[in-house]
Amino acid sequence: MPLPPRSLQVLLLLLLLLLLLPGMWAEAGLPRAGGGSQPPFRTFSASDWGLTHLVVHEQTGEVYVGAVNRIYKLSGNLTLLRAHVTGPVEDNEKCYPPPSVQSCPHGLGSTDNVNKLLLLDYAANRLLACGSASQGICQFLRLDDLFKLGEPHHRKEHYLSSVQEAGSMAGVLIAGPPGQGQAKLFVGTPIDGKSEYFPTLSSRRLMANEEDADMFGFVYQDEFVSSQLKIPSDTLSKFPAFDIYYVYSFRSEQFVYYLTLQLDTQLTSPDAAGEHFFTSKIVRLCVDDPKFYSYVEFPIGCEQAGVEYRLVQDAYLSRPGRALAHQLGLAEDEDVLFTVFAQGQKNRVKPPKESALCLFTLRAIKEKIKERIQSCYRGEGKLSLPWLLNKELGCINSPLQIDDDFCGQDFNQPLGGTVTIEGTPLFVDKDDGLTAVAAYDYRGRTVVFAGTRSGRIRKILVDLSNPGGRPALAYESVVAQEGSPILRDLVLSPNHQYLYAMTEKQVTRVPVESCVQYTSCELCLGSRDPHCGWCVLHSICSRRDACERADEPQRFAADLLQCVQLTVQPRNVSVTMSQVPLVLQAWNVPDLSAGVNCSFEDFTESESVLEDGRIHCRSPSAREVAPITRGQGDQRVVKLYLKSKETGKKFASVDFVFYNCSVHQSCLSCVNGSFPCHWCKYRHVCTHNVADCAFLEGRVNVSEDCPQILPSTQIYVPVGVVKPITLAARNLPQPQSGQRGYECLFHIPGSPARVTALRFNSSSLQCQNSSYSYEGNDVSDLPVNLSVVWNGNFVIDNPQNIQAHLYKCPALRESCGLCLKADPRFECGWCVAERRCSLRHHCAADTPASWMHARHGSSRCTDPKILKLSPETGPRQGGTRLTITGENLGLRFEDVRLGVRVGKVLCSPVESEYISAEQIVCEIGDASSVRAHDALVEVCVRDCSPHYRALSPKRFTFVTPTFYRVSPSRGPLSGGTWIGIEGSHLNAGSDVAVSVGGRPCSFSWRNSREIRCLTPPGQSPGSAPIIININRAQLTNPEVKYNYTEDPTILRIDPEWSINSGGTLLTVTGTNLATVREPRIRAKYGGIERENGCLVYNDTTMVCRAPSVANPVRSPPELGERPDELGFVMDNVRSLLVLNSTSFLYYPDPVLEPLSPTGLLELKPSSPLILKGRNLLPPAPGNSRLNYTVLIGSTPCTLTVSETQLLCEAPNLTGQHKVTVRAGGFEFSPGTLQVYSDSLLTLPAIVGIGGGGGLLLLVIVAVLIAYKRKSRDADRTLKRLQLQMDNLESRVALECKEAFAELQTDIHELTNDLDGAGIPFLDYRTYAMRVLFPGIEDHPVLKEMEVQANVEKSLTLFGQLLTKKHFLLTFIRTLEAQRSFSMRDRGNVASLIMTALQGEMEYATGVLKQLLSDLIEKNLESKNHPKLLLRRTESVAEKMLTNWFTFLLYKFLKECAGEPLFMLYCAIKQQMEKGPIDAITGEARYSLSEDKLIRQQIDYKTLTLNCVNPENENAPEVPVKGLDCDTVTQAKEKLLDAAYKGVPYSQRPKAADMDLEWRQGRMARIILQDEDVTTKIDNDWKRLNTLAHYQVTDGSSVALVPKQTSAYNISNSSTFTKSLSRYESMLRTASSPDSLRSRTPMITPDLESGTKLWHLVKNHDHLDQREGDRGSKMVSEIYLTRLLATKGTLQKFVDDLFETIFSTAHRGSALPLAIKYMFDFLDEQADKHQIHDADVRHTWKSNCLPLRFWVNVIKNPQFVFDIHKNSITDACLSVVAQTFMDSCSTSEHKLGKDSPSNKLLYAKDIPNYKSWVERYYADIAKMPAISDQDMSAYLAEQSRLHLSQFNSMSALHEIYSYITKYKDEILAALEKDEQARRQRLRSKLEQVVDTMALSS
């Protein structure tokens, strides 16, 4: 049947609801702990975007949420109504203005837009949402639907701040006066150092029209003042990290307040790399102060129990409740401020968990501020705003009257408070960390809600009058979102029913109260929740307004004392009673006239009657009670309720008891209970009704009347003996007719006995004659439980549990002594004749002496026996406690007191350790005088007659213990080392004590050869004597000492990480590690502690396996986590148990996927196995990686590891094999591998292959025969080549060895010469000029300048301008902005400025730092890689940096680095000159440069020439080594070097000015020249003359004489002059002028005459030469081995230089301050710009010092020394310089066969040099920072030393030439700059320009 339309609609609606319901609660939070069945909280979740801000509309209750890239509108119950997208946007933080306004040179990327400010503008019905994108622009959204009304973004006022931190900005929206419409926005924001772009605090206009051009314009702005406050750039340059973070803002009366966090500039050091301190400030402004004259800020915080809380987290402005207002002495409409502070002043981003909730009154804050303003206007103190420039300005006295409403003047502002405004601490949370706060007044009581880091809301009641002295009580804690911190915007709903709490991903609606969870009045009112009271008749905990008729008396309880109290009479009834009348009395109940019922829980209910204020009702019937009490023992407690007929609710209860007497089975338990029970002793029952007892005398009500057995003497019964047992009793009943008599029950295990008993009277009873027995002889006496019954099963009470003791005499008493020492109450004695223990009547004794009993005082046993001695050896000195075990060793101590001897030595028994008959312990006396070394032990019982004397079966030996060794012989000072002391007889005696260094060594065990003990802590390092006391013997050995060493320390663990399963190898570096034999590493994590052993290699190194931290509770996250504790168990060294210094991390174990779903993977042979997974490479710092082993079966495979997979080259296996992966302690099997062998071929295939193979074989044989013939020829060639290669290798090695030895000798001679003459350092002035102005010998700054007086005055004024930092910076920046300002100009200006400021080095350093800071900023803003910074000289700053180091490192060069540099230069020069050098090409036999290597064999001989001393012809001739292939000029150079050894180059003759004269006798003298008529010419090639050409012989005498002018020279001089310029242009390279000169060939070819000059090799550019000399050149690359030989020869000198440069302290010189200072500056800049890439920092330092200074000096030693550098030396130094640069680089050098030879040459050395550089940079970083005072003093000293080196007037004149050239641009720049205008810099410069113009 079809459904009607209406039904169909209803059905569809129901279905829709069913579908929606699950979704409505899908993302709900958790109910509170301890809660009842309350439904979960409503939530809104944002999975994609982090939430940041939340506001609630005060009329509609709608919720607006700001997030990353989104704005959401939610209903009051958190249903999503609208979402508005704000991002991501294409942006770059460096783009100012944003890309939407102006194209940006920086790369754009997808950028999140973080909502930082969310405010409701009720008057304009819009939402103001400000984000982080596009420099912090804001959007206006319509409240109804989030429609975007406007987004002002085109003016600078629209950009609030680009900082991305969400919780750092705060604003207050001030509505305009009614009718005028214009509102104001006060906004505070951090600026991230961009003070030129953003004010930190400002007041903006909010226009009615969102597109209005004046939107966000400053409320007031003129030329000097505006509604804004900026952080000065000087503050930021001193404290780059300085910023102000705005936590909370509010309006109170006519003021706007901000709570801020800012860097504490007084506690934070400007150069501190890490430690930043913060302080909280409260900032106040007048609402109507557009000029911000009213700005005041005060430190704010609170203190509790001596702990300071200074980091503000959140605040909330509220009104106090009536009670709190009264306690504070305030009116109820005054404002109070609740704040949350974290402890201390560190870690703004992650503050400590310990936090405090504090209370401030606005009245007190205003009063403090007023007092401060008044004191300042009285002229007291300073402005004291630490972060403003005018903080040191004094206050100005003024007669103004300062009242509460004062809003400031244009002086005495802005003002800072010096005293902290302290709040009242209300509540301290030490565990969870408070993060947010909100508060409100509920019915006159103040309730505070505090959010925590763990996602909870704490509800706190504030009551300053608490009797316990606690001003606040946290009465409840509920979870909003577990584990996620509550963010700042904690907001109440308009009706105060709910609290909206926000975490990063969720908004939760938390009810302000959850009274319904409390189920009783006591719980409800005991919770102290001020919202909750007890609604009496409804029996529910609720708000007052939720309780019906709550205002009527006693219907609503608001206090614990008002809870309903109920009593009942009687309080109990027997289960057998029915309908007992009960009277109930109730207190604190309302009017019950509507009627009540009595309800016994849910069992029964009865009507009640109200009479005289009492309630009367009846108990249930016995039939109804029976099921209630069944199985409940003797009582059942039930709740008796009063149930209101009005509400149907049970509203009061009292405990009521039903008791049951009949369960008691004994008289005593019956009458001793809590209830009125009676015992019927004749019926043996317990009843509540006394009438149930038939006999009156049988009724018992008290325990004294109960029948019971009384304690009498103990009952001892020998087994097998018939005897009666009499018992004492009380109130024994006389059995009545028909009742049976008494019996005794003995509960003997295995054979219980029932014996008839006779009742004598009511107090006496006898168990009749009977014998008793028990099985076995292993028990000598057996206590047996005894019961007395009558009438079959009526048990008489035995309250004392009286027992009978059965005993057997022979059991366990085989000897006389054991028999007689038995308890005398056992009638056992020793039957002498039968030699057994028995009862007397069982012994056939004919005399009394035949049976002995202990009661006979003189009894003693015969035949004592010694069975065992312990110990069996002891020292002669005595004192050994000898334990003698045996039989019949006396019965009393007196029997043996004097009867024990060891041989002749008395042994004194110790009474306390004597065991009758069985054991004697005695102390042996001194046996020193006894010669015998062993003796028998004798025991005499009373006397030594034969029957009473015992001798030991073994002899006791007297020994002399000794020791001769201790192992280990050393250990830590803290002790705890197990040592073994070796010797002989060390187990002697009964007691041993060892002391080491006078302190006891804790004994463990010993044997005859060793004692083990644990060393005590030592007093100090060094040897400690060992003393062993064995009883009275004291053993010493002066040769054996134990050495205490300093405790081991741990310096480093490498790597500083492991995985969850541990097991990875850790190299531990420290000191004194070998002092501990078995060190162990320990780790504690998640409550579980584990240890692993370590292997010690030496005192500084050991290797440990990391302990596993695997546990079920906790595992490390992917980014790693520190263990709770990590340390080392090293004997007793406590300091290493927990290492605080290490940052050791544990990463999760690798996770590998199974090989396949089934676990079995099939694989072909030789196919790689790929194992996929994650966490395979932990993201640990450093180069260490996790080492994997993959086993196929038991065979390992070759592995390649990446982040997500292991690639395993499977071994050559077939079949099934288990795959196992191991890494450290981690082991996992991803499955089994099935490897198939290649499939077998079919028969036809085999036949086919066989036929084809045979044919192929014939072909192969033919080919092989042909190949064999060819290969025989090739073999011969190969062997010949191999022989040549071997010879070549041997030759290179030998050549290198010989050359080095020879060079060392030469250098040694040179060093000796230097010791006398000294290194020819240039003076400071020349050195500086060569670096600053290379190639200019006679620079104007070296000369005095003659000028007119007015010019001098102008230049002086210009000099003063240059010392104004702002002018100089503007000057430099303006020049650099000009296109015509060339690179050369930049270098020139930098050098001129440094010379002009030579006497102002501190100022110059400040300017340089600012320029470098700008350069870094510019570099980072451009697309250049940060590593390119300082790489090239493209700015004034870079050249200034070179000059700065030039000035400051001169002393270091002279004292330290100069010597190895000069030695390297000399070594290169000497080594080069040992072999031929081509005078034309500059190529040499020995070279480091491939380009300057002669690549063919040159035959030459070494000659020794005896040179006549040019200064004194009569002095001895100087022997000089030369080569016969040297040109005449080369020979002259060598002769001059020898003759003028030690003379600076500039002070000796030049080769061109001297002639070489060969003297062959007294008169025969020949002038030798490079070219003369004898010069050989061949096919247009003219060869220079050499010594061989002139046939100069070894030992020839030569002289250097002043140049003679000859006809030949005259004729050729013009040719030389003309050819010079052209040839120079061919060979010059870009270098310093001196090096240009040095690269000019020594002889210039005559190009005009058509002939070409050559010396050793013809120029490679000529083809005829290339073909013709092929034979002599062979393969030219073979000669590259000479590079290697030369490099090996010079290696030591290169190493020495590099080591000196890269050492922080060398040759007595400390590291120059300039280096440390500049490196620290670069680190600060990197920190400022958040550059954490170590490579970038390294590169900056390398570009700054090695590249800019050292490379220049290495390539150009003539800058430092007075020397001449020739072409080949220059080429070699360039190779060294390149190696130096490569060593400073961080990039990997990938080398191949095509790499340049100079790179290959030092390829193996560079990694080592790189490690030196890294260590050098690290050592510098570790050095303490240089204080500003020390640096200032150092720079002042440098200025003083070199004050007059340059003419400053000349330098100023040179600089002024640039002013002339760019006058207009510089003046315009000064006019544009605000600070320049303030300092009137333009007018001052114009004055200089005018004066200079007049003079010209």
UniProtKB/Swiss-Prot annotation:
The reply on keyword Membrane is: yes
* Topology of the protein relative to the lipid bilayer: Single-pass type I membrane protein
Q: What glycosylation sites does the entry record?
A: 77, 660, 672, 701, 1043, 1187, 1212
Q: Enumerate the subcellular locations listed in this protein's record, separating them with semicolons.
A: Cell membrane
GO annotation, biological process: dichotomous subdivision of terminal units involved in salivary gland branching; gonadotrophin-releasing hormone neuronal migration to the hypothalamus; neuron projection extension; neuron projection guidance; olfactory nerve formation; regulation of cell migration; regulation of smooth muscle cell migration; semaphorin-plexin signaling pathway
Q: Quote the tissue specificity entry.
A: Detected in fetal brain, lung, liver and kidney.
Residue spans crossing the bilayer: 1245-1265
Question: Keyword set for this entry?
Answer: Cell membrane, Coiled coil, Disease variant, Disulfide bond, Glycoprotein, Intellectual disability, Membrane, Repeat, Signal, Transmembrane, Transmembrane helix
Where do the coiled-coil regions begin and end?
A: 1264-1317
- Family per UniProt? Belongs to the plexin family.
Name which cysteines form disulfide bonds. 95-104, 130-138, 286-407, 302-358, 376-395, 515-532, 521-563, 524-541, 535-547, 598-617
Main function = Coreceptor for SEMA3A, SEMA3C, SEMA3F and SEMA6D. Necessary for signaling by class 3 semaphorins and subsequent remodeling of the cytoskeleton. Plays a role in axon guidance, invasive growth and cell migration. Class 3 semaphorins bind to a complex composed of a neuropilin and a plexin. The plexin modulates the affinity of the complex for specific semaphorins, and its cytoplasmic domain is required for the activation of down-stream signaling events in the cytoplasm.
Topology check: give the Cytoplasmic ranges: 1266-1896
CDD domains for this protein: IPT_PCSR (cd00603), IPT_plexin_repeat1 (cd01180), IPT_plexin_repeat2 (cd01179), IPT_plexin_repeat3 (cd01181), RasGAP_plexin_A (cd12790), Sema_plexin_A1 (cd11271)
As given in the record, the signal peptide range reads 1-26
List all topological domains (Extracellular).
27-1244
The GO cellular component terms are: cytosol; extracellular exosome; glutamatergic synapse; nucleoplasm; plasma membrane; semaphorin receptor complex
Disorder this protein is connected to according to its UniProt record: Dworschak-Punetha neurodevelopmental syndrome: An autosomal recessive disorder characterized by global developmental delay, mildly impaired intellectual development, speech delay, and behavioral abnormalities including autism spectrum disorder and hyperactivity. Additional variable additional features include optic disk hypoplasia, ptosis, hypo- or hyperpigmented skin lesions, non-specific facial dysmorphism, and abnormalities of the ventricles or corpus callosum seen on brain imaging.
The Sema domain, residue ranges? 27-512
Which Gene3D superfamilies does the record match to this protein? GTPase Activation - p120gap, domain 1, Immunoglobulins, YVTN repeat-like/Quinoprotein amine dehydrogenase
Task: Name the species this protein comes from.
Answer: Homo sapiens
Q: Using the record's annotation, list all stretches that form the IPT/TIG domain.
A: 864-959, 961-1045, 1048-1147, 1150-1236
Name this protein carries in UniProt: Plexin-A1
GO molecular function, a single term: semaphorin receptor activity
Q: Subunit structure, per the record?
A: Interacts directly with NRP1 and NRP2. Interacts with PLXN1B. Interacts with FARP2, RND1 and KDR/VEGFR2. Binding of SEMA3A leads to dissociation of FARP2. Interacts with CRMP1, DPYSL2/CRMP2, DPYSL3/CRMP3 and DPYSL4/CRMP4. Interacts (via TIG domains) with TREM2; the interaction mediates SEMA6D binding and signaling through TYROBP.
